[in-house]
Amino acid sequence: MSGLCLVLLLSIFAVSQSSGECSDVSFSSVASKLDGLKRVTRLSVSGHISAYHVKVSISDDDFQLVRLSNGNPLVLYSTLSNTPSWTHVDFLATEVRIFPAFEQATEDVRGPLLILTICDYDTPITAFDDSSYTVEAHHAGLVSMYENDLCVVFRTYRSGVFFFSMADQGDVLIAQIIHGTVHVIFDFGSLTPSRISAGKALDDGRWHEMRWLHQFDSVQLSIDGVLLNQTAPTGLYRKLDLHSVVHIGGRPNDDFSQGIETTFTGCIARLQLNNADLLQLSPNEVHNQCQMPKPPSFTLHNSSRAVLPFTFLPFSFEFRIVPINGPLVTLFDAENGTLVDVVIDEESKLHLVSNITKFKQAANPAIDVADGAWHSFSLRIRGVRMEIDIDGYTVLWLEGHEVRRVSQRLSNFILSASGCYRSVTIDLTSVRVDGNVTRGECTFQEKCLPNPCENGGGCVQSALDDYVCNCKEGYKGKNCHTTDLPHSCEEWVFTKGNKQKAVQGRKVLIDIDGGGEMQPINVTCKTERDEIGIDGVSTILEHDLLRPMIVTGDNKPGAVRYSLTYGISTEQMDRLVEGFEACSQFMRYTCRGGARLMTQGDERSPSSWYSTRSDKHGLQWGEAPPYSRMCSCAINGSCLHNRMCNCDSGEDSTDEGVNPYSQLLPVTGLFLGGTTKSSSIEVEIGPLKCRNRATFDPVTFSNRNAKLSGAQTFNQRTFDVSLHVKFSHSQMSILSWHSTDDLHWFHLYVNDGKIVGEVVNGGESQQIVSEHRYDDGKFHAIYWEADSTGMFLKVDGQRKSVKTSFILPTVYMWIVGSRTEKGSTGFAGVIRNVHLCGVELALGQYARKETERGVAIGDDGYCRPDLCQNGGQCVDKYDGYVCDCSMTPFGGSDCTKEYGMMVPAGSSIQIPWQNPAHQAMCHRIAIQTTSRNTTILRSKALFADSTFNMTVDDNGNLQMMAYDGFFFHFKRQSKRHNLSDDIMHDISFCASKHHFNVSVDGMQVITIEGNWTFFESFNVWHFLDENFEGCVSRIQTGSAFPLKNPKTARLNYSGKIRFGTCPIEAVSRQQMYDFNPQPDLISSTIKTSTEDIKIFSVSQNKQDLVSKAIIGGGILALSLFILCMSSLICYMRSRPEGVYKTNETGENCSPSRSEEPLVHNTTSNNNNNPTYASNKEYFC
């Protein structure tokens, strides 16, 4: 007991010595020099809102970037709060520097305030020169543990061993570095050592940290704070027992440790195992000052080279290059002629090529020299033999007289491969270089550790500071994150052109988590009707048991086993099934010869059963309740002999049904038996069928203050969100995902009807905006993706991308909608199929839980059939509605406002040339009159002979005549209505390729078959003639509405016309026409037939007329102004739009093609002779 207490005291002492006293210090600059080597545990920055990266130096001003476990640089966010926002870290440093994370960050004139929590670290940096020491485990406080943590901070240029422990009972823990890669060998007593390795080019003489972390069933290896590898221990044991004596910086000399380095040469600043500082326990004579001379080096960038004069052999250097095929070393003569080339091929293998004899040799062994690690190169010539060594192995050689010629003529060595070079025998600081070269340091940035390529993509370092991903089929993008595969069958059917394919069923590859780690799944998508007659999309997952399984002979219960293979993992099964509201699977069990299902033998136990995806036994069949030992027939009491299953009756029978319990599905295995030589069973399992993907349920937001929210942490390399949404407002917030302090966020919103994706981080903002508007009330598919190199936005397949460098924020809380949130305008519309970084957001389930007012499940807006009248379209705003009356002759908020005019006899109303954009096949007019034998409208084509007339005959009946301009005349009459009965009648007529129809008051009165395509060419309209007297409204010519928008429709009129609603009940017709304007005003009205028409609504309530005296006075006051402006208005408003051509030469237009010229016959003032319009202008 006393011994255990001593061990605990020593352990506590070692921990206290390691940690030391901690305190907070602050610096008003971006650089903070500490008082010696300290352990930094917390960081915070105070100042204007910005973002900073962190670099630390242990010694020699060698600064390294601090990174997170996922490989991203650590980002410190400064705040204006007086309370520090701490970021927890754990590293050693003598100096800490921060610098803006953004290249063009806003400069803070005051400078940021850097706050650190530092702890005393009294252990000196120890230098090892092929020397080592031992530590007694009990003296260091090391005990057997189920969780272990080994941390080593080191720098070296060579391979070596850090820690060595091999216990007598077989437990092993060895940490070493070999060719720049850290290797850890461990065993917890199973006598089967496991290995884990990570890192690359760590023998570069810079400070690095390796951390081996064991947590019972998990082992991780991190390099410089980045998790690079992880595995699971083998065997049954999980506790690590150390040898009584552990070795630091070496190992004992024995014959059992082959493949393990014997010593270590370099420096170690920290070596801790389970918080025991083993470096502090080193002997005093080992504490040498860390002095590591830095060899001369330089970095060759693309298209650069270095020329090294030949002085002596061997010619030796170390290199770390980018995997680009081309020459590594070229031997030149004095005339710059190539003697020998050492080149790198596409597989990063070396070849030797002689320019003299054209001899080519491949390296043997074939060493990958472009893997990003440091390699040694040595060229030597001995007599008639030239040898090239890579990493100490002779891989290339050349023999014969050719070697003599090379040695005699050799003048220069040319290095041209892009990468880093260093040498202790060659002065690389003074070599002649061509191109972009960085001297004195290696600027090679490892971009493929950890692998940034997702979904099985391979990373290749393409430049000193860049990489490319070789993506697998179906994925693309910088990091192989982007995929065009649908998330579900519902999404696939929604895609244009797939609805018809789904009727028969189609094999589809779906990716549930989008660009996430989960692999795609092959399913069958089919549109079919369920048992209650509702059409829906079914997702069908097939297995490999295509035919029924037959079992016979003597078999014990469950003796015959068969595993059903679906081609997916258990994780994929869980994600697939759990995402649906309902899944089912057909099951059939046929028994013959007395075989039983649930009551076998004296124990009356099941003879056959199945296994679920969670490896549980399913002890029921068909629709029977889970684990009930019943079959489907027991539910309705139809089993034979009142048993629980038909196959428990002892007779030949069948139990079948559809298993509807998702927790039991799919059936992954069959355990069959209970048969004899005279009995048999036959089992059939159908495919898994699922319906109603929960995330595809639409959710309607009818209150812009409503919201749905949830928590999800984002700390990945790539952000993405995909959803389906429809809306009608031009300004809205769809989805936001923000940090806890609301200073950093992703925001997807609508601005001016366009989709906008915005990333805000550290006071910097990046936006991407769609090209088109989408506030049309229709579903649109949106996908937005962002990473450190840029982002792109895809709406309905139309993609827009932005290339820029920025940092993705760390966010936690997502919100859909909510006007009350900061910077949010709320959401009103329908949203579904939301996937946020591979996670399905089933908003319908959130809506059920939160019961938020203004949020409802389903696609149900405000619009109802009776809200908009007279053919107006209801535009659903989801928090309200508006009526679109633009395609009707009506107006007002509900399309009930009439636009009409009282037309006295002698008036003229016409459209001299209709805008071509308004021409169509359907037209409309409403009249109220007592006139007979009058024309309702006349129409013709400017450049054709076709005509159309509609009149009221002597009996008040409707009569129409048409001529197609070539052969056929049409004439019809309808006697069903008396159009002269002083009642408003609504007349509409439409033509098509094969029919012409006329309707009066909604009743079809005339139908003519034939070719009526000529009807679309009518572009000259005359309404009513001089005999007509009454009220007219609802005029529609194609897509134009002359009474509603006279300027747009190019309406001209003349006469004593009064505009207002029709019919006008406030005054009689006599009162409406009984006014005597000034003669000048009358002539002005006639002359300015194309002046602006202003339409006023006349109230239906009766009002007293304004006295004629007051009206006359007003008219006299305005007459002078009207006379002055009439000529200018006439000129500007009377000419139709277009281009006029003169017909004087007859080259452009033929006057005979028009029935009526645009300029009517006039009389010359000089000779009173008529001047014909055919000699003037025609519109072409």
UniProtKB/Swiss-Prot annotation:
Parts of the chain on the Cytoplasmic side: 1130-1180
Compositional bias (Low complexity): 1161-1171
GO MF term set: actin filament binding; calcium ion binding; gap junction channel activity
Subcellular location: Cell membrane; Cell junction, Gap junction
All ranges on the Extracellular side of the membrane: 21-1108
Extent of Polar residues compositional bias: 1142-1152
Transmembrane segment boundaries: 1109-1129
Tissue-by-tissue expression: Highly expressed in pharyngeal g1 and g2 gland cells, pharyngeal muscle cells and the unilateral GABAergic RIS interneuron (at protein level). Expressed in pm5 pharyngeal muscle cells and the nerve ring.
Biological processes annotated in GO: positive regulation of gap junction assembly; positive regulation of nematode pharyngeal pumping
UniProt region (Disordered), positions on chain: 1142-1180
Entry keyword Disulfide bond: yes
Pfam family, one: EGF
EGF-like domain boundaries: 444-481, 859-896
Membrane topology: Single-pass type I membrane protein
Keywords recorded for this protein, A-Z: Cell junction, Cell membrane, Disulfide bond, EGF-like domain, Gap junction, Glycoprotein, Membrane, Receptor, Repeat, Signal, Transmembrane, Transmembrane helix
Gene ablation phenotype (knockout): RNAi-mediated knockdown results in abherrent inx-3-positive gap junction formation along the adjoining membranes of EA and EP endodermal precursor cells at the 16-24 cell stage of embryogenesis, and in adult pharyngeal muscles. The inx-3-positive gap junctions are increased in number, are randomly positioned at irregular intervals on either the EA and EP cells and, although they are along the membrane, they are not on the membrane.
UniProt signal peptide: 1-20
Sites where a glycan is attached: 229, 302, 336, 355, 436, 522, 636, 933, 949, 978, 997, 1011, 1052
Laminin G-like domain location: 124-290, 695-863
Entry keyword Transmembrane: yes
GO-annotated cellular components: gap junction; plasma membrane
Disulfide pairings: 267-290, 448-459, 453-469, 471-480, 863-874, 868-883, 885-895
Family: Belongs to the neurexin family.
Function recorded in the entry: Required for gap junction formation, playing a role in anchoring the cytoskeletal component F-actin to the membrane of adjacent cells and thus facilitating the formation of gap junction channels in embryonic cells, muscle cells and neuronal cells. Plays a role in maintaining gap junction activity to promote pharyngeal muscle contraction.
Subunit (UniProt): Interacts (via the intracellular domain) with F-actin; the interaction is required for anchoring F-actin at the membrane for gap junction formation.
The protein's name: Neurexin like receptor 1
Species this chain originates from: Caenorhabditis elegans
Gene that this polypeptide is encoded by: nlr-1
